[in-house]
Curated annotation (Swiss-Prot):
The gene is gap. InterPro entries: DapB_N, GlycerAld/Erythrose_P_DH, GlycerAld_3-P_DH_AS, GlycerAld_3-P_DH_cat, GlycerAld_3-P_DH_NAD(P)-bd, Glyceraldehyde-3-P_DH_2_arc, NAD(P)-bd_dom_sf. It comes from Pyrobaculum neutrophilum (strain DSM 2338 / JCM 9278 / NBRC 100436 / V24Sta) (Thermoproteus neutrophilus). One of its GO terms (biological process) is glycolytic process. The active site is at C140 (nucleophile). NAD(+) binds at T11, I12, G110, R169, Q302. This is Glyceraldehyde-3-phosphate dehydrogenase.
Amino acid sequence: MIRVGIVGYGTIGKRIADAVVAQDDMKIAGVLKVSPDYEAKVAVSRGFPVYTLPDRVEKFKKAGIEPAGTIEDLIKASDVVVDASPEDVGRENKEKYYQRYDKPVIFQGGEEADVAEVSFNALANYEEARGKRYVRVVSCNTTGITRVLTSLTLNGVGIKKARIFIARRGADPKEHKKGPINDVVPNPATVPSHHGPDVQTILRNVDIVTMAVAVPVTIMHMHMAYIELDSAYPKDQVIEAFAKTPRIFLADVGAGFQSLAQVIEYARDLGRPRGDFPEVAVFRDSVTTHGNELYLMYGVHQESIVVPENIDAIRSIFGTLPKWRSIEKTDKSLKLTTEGKRYG
């Protein structure tokens, strides 16, 4: 059993913790919280050992939470650390704590790529994390783009270039201090946005340019993609590539999927925890080919899309399972869509 320590028990960290619990080859060593808030109390109620920073121990005790130890105690108790801290805090933790211990660490996409030896996406470069000490699971948007492009190339559909336009959610549902509320904000106003270069940390030879705006929604991101293929492919072949690829979901307007809100409602109706939707939701009706040009729209659930990637990254680091066996094991354990998917 791989002992997993999770630093940061917020939007991503708590979901990774639940995903680890669902595995039969991993277990939670503990989670780190810096504030004794309701999330810390939820972690305690889940039976997770809760650790904190040295200067926060007394604050936790006063709040009625007895810490299991400090961050360094958590590192020592873990075989691997998943750092799900806010943006840039992961790098600070690396410099202050992780470098002193011979333990692998998985960072999230909020960190710059050079925090790790390799950027990771299970479909695209699972094997590259093998034996690495520092691995970075790329961001939600980068994960979505990488999955879509890789699903094509894995199924014999070649890509010459990709131009992706992103309508980013303004904030996560719980983020009451973020926006916009009544605006559309270039994010950034310069071209390209950081997503394209981030994709290239995994798909190194892809010609890609991305642009992004932030919009006043909280549920998901929407991507609008123009992809130039290496030749003309039938639309049915492209759709079949998406249909066979794990972690891609084809949403049909005729089945009631007319918006991203309905994708999330579907997740809730399935009984998925928190209404999560880790798959990329490709709108089948949007998939259009014109000669060697491909157009499509797809949704990315920012709160959960990277969760299965973190589980696979753990197995890749330790070499416990080959690529497709790990992806299938993760998908089944998290009850993702597996019907009709090809694992290998």
